[in-house]
Amino acid sequence: MSVYHLPTLLNPLVNAIFNCPEPERSPLKKLFANLKTRRFILLAPPSEYLLNYHDVKSKLPLHDLCYNAEFINSYILLMTENSYINTNSRDSHYETLDGKTVVIQWKNNVIHALNGFHIRRRLKILETKILPNFNDYFEGAADFIILFIDQPLNCEFVPNDYLQCFHNYEKIPKNAHAMPNLSIDSFQQERSSFENILHIHPARLTQLGQLFSSYRTLAPGDDPSRSIFESIVQQAFDGMKSDSLFKNFSNLYDLIHDYFELNLYDDIWSRLTTHFKGHEVDTEKYKYFSVNQLLTDFYSKDYGEFELHDITLIERRLHLASKHLQKLALTHSYAEKSKILVETLQKLSGTTEMDSHQLELPDGLNNMTMDADTLISLFVLVVCRSEQKHLKSHLYYLQNFSNNSSSTKFGILGYAVSTLEAVVCYFEDFNKNTGNVAKANTLCEKTKNLLDKLSCENPTNEVEDLATYKDILTYRNEQGQSILSICITNHKNYILLDILSEYETDFPVEDLLEDETIDGSTLLIESIKAGNLEAAKVLIKIMLFNCTEEELVSYINKTDKYARTVAHYLTHEMDILKSIGNYIDWKRKNSSGQTPLFSIFRSYDQPNYEEMVKTAFDIANTWYRKHNSLFDYLDHTDNKGNSLLHVLKTNIPILLQLTKLDINEENYKGLTPLMVYVKYKRLSNIDAITKDRRLILEKVQNSTFFTCFDYAKDHSVLSKIGERGVKDSLFGLIYFHSLRYHNLNATTNITSVSNAEKPFATTVINMKTIQGLLRSILKDNPFTFLPLNTYIDEISHLNRSDLTIIGKTDVTSLLHELTNCFNVLLFLKKIPENLFTDEASILYWMRINTSKRNQKPSGKENPKTMEPEEINMIQSFLRFNFDEISSFKASLNILRKVLIFINLKSDDFEDAYKGLNEMGRKLINSEASSAFKGIITNHNMFSELSLAELLENVRFLEQCTIQLSSFVQIILFEKIPNWWKHYGEFLALHKSYRKAFPNMVKPKSASDTSSRAPLGGFIETKREQSEQRLAVQIKASSKMLKELGSEIFVAHERLAEELSNYMEFRKACLDQRSLVAFATTNISVLQECV
């Protein structure tokens, strides 16, 4: 075995198994011998762990353990026949080299380490890679599968000591939990212990049950009777405090109080609601209360001091507080009620965190004092909008059923209860309907009347006397909509125009710019969402006429709670897009990571989709140039990894013209743009992208190992992408793709060059027919350099109805081999061009070919006598060609390994760079950490497309060269030496004959001797018997020489022809279709990265 030295791979485990320069001297030589002819899967932990961690038990670094057979055995999964079968209903079971059990859930990319592992782990498959075999000691497969897992498998590991210079290096464990609040936790433990003791001692439970019954008996049906409740609680406390069972509880009274409250709450609450029946606060008639009515002092500020965005912020806080107060109806204890009340007031006053959208807003309330009156006024609105039905009952409960009466009088809870009490009084004053209250009630009625007229159910689009509603035009509903917003959403455009023209002073441009709903929607966003384009155009006209460019940019790029600007809602509003397009921030992303351009591209239901897409792209391009930059395609990738190419329905040439464009980019599901087009049958996009030279047609989806052909369900789609496959094939003549199974019969789609009306034809052919065709061709060309026997055998194994990743890789490899094989056969004109028109054509050609072959005379009938000079000439010819082929084969072997390692080391470089960046960011020294940000790399020395194509062609050419070399080797080192051996024996026999019978001209034949013998048992002489025996031997030797010579002659003629074909194929394959294509593609692709 030759010793070779290839670069070391970054991952120590992968390097140890596949990249051993001297396997016979390696400590893993027994493992290599065991795996020599076997197929297996390697589980590879991340290089980060193997290089920077050590085993807790052995104290050895993990990269040293990678050269320990016992450690490695657990990472090698042996493959059996069942490894190919994939059923979605059950998982795939594998056995490791040391007998442990591993279960792989291919669908979820999860591995379970089970029987035999002392640590059972659930591992995540991070990536699946196909590693072309580049060593000489594994013969079981041409490609091996590596499953990269998220952590080591069969050991406990910790970071090495040198990582102490990094902070927070260790990853947070999956099951880690935040530290609990100790005080709350201890109280909960005491409560649990208290309840456990009660359940263990039924006598105590019986005593407490009697007290519960006494409350239900003594307390009137319409009176909650706080005194009775407190009395039975005190009675239970007096009876339990001296009991040794409860002496260790520090909060015994609170525990007893809470336990009684838990068991008697329904009784107390029913008595409360009965008690206040008919006297509760009815908030239904106050549903039209608005901020402008309750914060009159704020609205009466001078024009220079009033800012509408303060009101919009108040509306958002009101909304949050109202939603939270609704939870009060679900409470069943004093603690729950008090918690809801306090949190509601905190949300209202802005003292707690709000959602991310609101945190970005300026605190407009800093311009006003949040005094008690203001808070009460806002809380009135909260109560109205939360639609609380038992407000007095909740207040009474909070005031009377606390386990600590001082808590409701002092502190934040005392303030909250006082505020609630003031609100109840506020509503009681409203019910009296006197003074200012009567005026407020009148405004509510007037508001209701106006809103009815503005309702979308009202067909009238006019208000007869708008002036009568002047005092309520500042109304805002619970969604934060102003009167203008309500007009817009209900398409009351005449009223909208009247308000804007007649009451311009009440609605200045500054307020129009700040008018937003609670979800952040501006008037312009509302108009687009409502489809009210007329209102949108009015607003845009006002803005363009009255606002500066800075104000326009700020307004148009305001975002709602979904981080969407008005541009994100523009789907088919061409005129509006043109009017405001230059002010749009085209890089601004919404919460889903989608830019405005992405949203427009993704809006498929618009009637003028292509025109809208083209217009939006041109405007965005202009915007980029205006900001002194080029259009950046990467700015428009969403949170799921979808690019503009992924979502564009038609007209992709506008994107394909971009230079720095990765048209093979995968989203987070592993789908390329082409896969998406094929999946959704976007034929125009398929047609355009398959003409782009940058396309990698057979890009594989990592999680499923699907290619675009696996998503094609339509013949027209298969034909279109098959045409690109033909053009990318070795000689551009034929392409095999899309293996399908029908009742365990495998069929394949074949696209080939056609002489008919269309330049290409796609047909479905049974794989058994292809197998028969290969057998027929092999009979006609027994010395072909194409490894047809290998392909025939591989087709025989295609009997599985469903395939795992392992099977899919084999199928993909076979289809590539058949594509290359039939490209060569067509190139050398061994089969007719129109053979693949349909399956019947193939079967007919096979029958005709068989008939012609049977009619040819057999070479054995007229064996050719070969002279030594002729054998010498053949031997010299074959030896020269064998030396040339061997030299070329060695060069191909080196080239194949170099190409594989270029790809492997490029990946290693990228992984190492990512690891270095990751570690650099964790350096404790901030200056050192920041230095890592400036590291620039350029690991893409060659394009992925050009490397893959060249490697596939080199591997195929190497297979063909090995096949031809084996034929030459058989003739040169077996057949010809055998002829010379028999020739020597023949000469020796002749010499012996001449020496023994010098007077004989030539040896007698057996027939001649027998004819001269007389009838009856005449005894031949010893001399005659010897002469006859030598004559028979000479004849047999002569016959053998003729047969061997004839066989060598025929083989030489066919090999000479095959060598000629091989040289023609080699030159075209290596020079034109491989090296030149590699250089051309690589230069053109990499030029775009400069």
Swiss-Prot record:
Domain VPS9, chain residue ranges per copy: 289-436
One GO biological process term: early endosome to late endosome transport
Cellular component per GO, a single term: plasma membrane
SUPFAM superfamilies: Pseudo ankyrin repeat-like (SSF140860), VPS9 domain (SSF109993)
GO molecular function: guanyl-nucleotide exchange factor activity; SNARE binding
Family assignment from sequence similarity: Belongs to the UPF0507 family.
Protein name: UPF0507 protein EC1118_1M3_1541g
Organismal lineage: Eukaryota, Fungi, Dikarya, Ascomycota, Saccharomycotina
